[in-house]
A protein has these predicted regions:
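Extended, hydrophobic alpha-helical segments
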Residues: 1-30, 36-43
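A sequence-composition feature that detects small, non-aromatic residues
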Residues: 2-3, 45, 54, 72
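Loop/helix-junction capping segments adjacent to catalytic residues or to phosphate/diphosphate-binding pockets
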Residues: 13, 46, 74
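Positively charged, polar, low-complexity stretches
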Residues: 17, 42-56, 84-88
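Surface-exposed beta-strand edges and their flanking turn/coil or helix-capping segments
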Residues: 19-21, 37, 52-54, 77-79, ...
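A common structural junction motif
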Residues: 25-31, 55-62
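A generic structural motif
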Residues: 32-37, 63-67
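C-terminal structural segments of small proteins and small subunits
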Residues: 56-88
């Protein structure tokens, strides 16, 4: 299983519901910042990108980055901090 950070910028209608539904479908996820999510999955970054971009407009932006266990953060809730410690 790998952890991926997902960042996005929806430029037109900013309808996040379909994208968020797809992100949450991974089951193991965290939403630490407004446009940033972290998921844990057996898929590759390319597979995650392709699955998510299917509900995005052509001018939206999406970045899926693999996380390798090292991380630092500031100003996040205790629940999110604990999730990160458990899953990174």
């Amino acid at each position: 299983m790998a952890a991926y950070q997902i960042s996005y910028d929806l430029r037109k209608q900013k309808d996040y519901s379909s994208l968020i539904e797809r992100i949450k479908s991974y089951g193991t996820w965290c939403h630490p910042l407004e446009s940033t999510w972290i998921i844990v999955t057996e898929q590759t970054a390319t597979q995650v990108r392709d699955y998510l971009k299917a509900v995005m407009d052509n001018d939206d932006g999406l970045l899926v980055t693999g996380l390798r266990g090292d991380g630092a953060w500031y100003g996040l809730s205790d629940n999110i901090s604990q999730w990160l410690k458990n899953n990174l």
